[in-house]
From Swiss-Prot:
Further comment found in the protein's record: Some rotavirus strains are neuraminidase-sensitive and require sialic acid to attach to the cell surface. Some rotavirus strains are integrin-dependent. Some rotavirus strains depend on ganglioside for their entry into the host cell. Hsp70 also seems to be involved in the entry of some strains.
SUBUNIT field: Homotrimer; disulfide-linked. 2 Ca(2+) ions bound at each subunit interface in the trimer hold the trimer together. Interacts with the intermediate capsid protein VP6. Interacts with the outer capsid protein VP5*.
Protein name in UniProt: Outer capsid glycoprotein VP7
Phylogenetic placement of the source organism: Viruses, Riboviria, Orthornavirae, Duplornaviricota, Resentoviricetes
Residues modified by glycosylation: N69, N238
Keyword RNA-binding: no
Annotated localization: Virion; Host endoplasmic reticulum lumen
Role summary: Calcium-binding protein that interacts with rotavirus cell receptors once the initial attachment by VP4 has been achieved. Rotavirus attachment and entry into the host cell probably involves multiple sequential contacts between the outer capsid proteins VP4 and VP7, and the cell receptors. Following entry into the host cell, low intracellular or intravesicular Ca(2+) concentration probably causes the calcium-stabilized VP7 trimers to dissociate from the virion. This step is probably necessary for the membrane-disrupting entry step and the release of VP4, which is locked onto the virion by VP7.
Length: 326
């Protein structure tokens, strides 16, 4: 009996010793693997870049554009950019491959081929009737024309801000603007807007509600009109509804994925003086104009700096959506 007990105890002790040996062996193996792994990391670390230092720009690139040393992915690598320009630019350049040339130049700034779209428009008036902006970032080039300052200013106000709009039935109802952010926006091939302010008895102030010839004319044969009248006063309106549509709109705030670039002109259009523009900064810039090639070269050179002043937004703009909400 004692022999069996001794054998059992001996077997137990041997098992404990073997288990201890196995555990120590495993520990030594794990230490060996971990230390070797850390040694490899230490050796290779000088050869690895821990951060993304941005796009490797060629020497001919813009040195004026600041690039932040950041691990954040650059937005333009996964975004689309639309460039709107007047048709006279393509006419002057007179080169069938000029868009391909610009695409290659945008590539040097980090915009992959196929991410930049070129869209032309005939003139400011026609563009204001049917603005369509579907890209993540939208740059609108407007050549300065002293005779079109008002149209350019109103178009910039329309594009650079979001508006909540509702239809107006001017044949049945009077309308009033509640505050400075409330405007009446008209679009069409020819918009002539006349207004007649009313007193509390709905009688015309300086006009007859039954005679549109006595109404005050605030716009004549325009394609885009942003009408501002005295707040809190009812008005009867007369609009050329056969060629124009009018909407009651409320300015909600800036549309941050749009920038307007004024091309040429001694004066810079400024819509920030409008009390409804908050904050008092806008994505409206100016570049010198001599030739359109020079303009496009400047845009390419500063595109990333311009985009940094904008914010990527998913909401698109077109004339149909504008009437209700943009």
């Amino acid at each position: 009996m004692y022999g069996i007990e001794y054998t059992t105890v001996l077997t137990f002790l041997i098992s404990v010793i073997l288990l201890n040996y196995v555990l120590k062996s495993l520990t030594r193996i794990m230490d060996f693997i971990i230390y070797r792994f850390l040694l490899i990391i230490v050796i290779l670390s000088p050869l690895l870049n821990a951060q993304n230092y941005g796009i490797n720009l060629p020497i001919t690139g813009s040195m004026d554009t600041p690039y932040t040393n950041s691990t954040r992915e650059e937005v333009f690598l996964t975004s689309t950019l639309c460039l709107y320009y007047p048709t006279e630019a393509a006419t002057e350049i007179n080169d069938n491959s000029w868009k391909d040339t610009l695409s290659q130049l945008f590539l040097t700034k980090g915009w992959p081929t196929g991410s930049v779209y070129f869209k032309d428009y005939t003139d400011i008036a026609s563009f204001s009737v049917d603005p369509q902006m579907y890209c993540d970032y939208n740059l609108v080039l407007m050549k300065y024309d002293a005779t079109l300052q008002l149209d350019m200013s109103e178009l910039a106000d329309l594009l650079l801000n979001e508006w909540l709009c509702n239809p107006m039935d001017i044949t049945l109802y009077y309308y009033q603007q509640t505050d400075e952010a409330n405007k009446w926006i008209s679009m069409g091939s020819s918009c002539t807007i006349k207004v007649c302010p009313l007193n509390t008895q709905t009688l015309g102030i300086g006009c007859l509600t039954t005679d549109t010839n006595t109404f005050e004319e605030v716009a004549t044969a325009e394609k885009l009109v942003i009408t501002d009248v005295v707040d809190g006063v009812n008005h009867k309106l007369n609009v050329t509804t056969n060629t124009c549509t009018i909407r009651n709109c409320k300015k909600l705030g800036p549309r941050e994925n749009v920038a307007v670039i004024q091309v040429g002109g001694s004066d810079v259009l400024d819509i920030t003086a409008d009390p409804t523009t908050m904050p008092q900064t806008e994505r409206m810039m100016r570049v010198n104009w001599k030739k359109w090639w020079q303009v496009f070269y400047t845009i390419v050179d500063y595109v990333n700096q311009i985009v940094q002043a904008m914010s990527k937004r998913s909401r698109s703009l077109n004339s149909a959506a504008f009437y209700y909400r943009v």
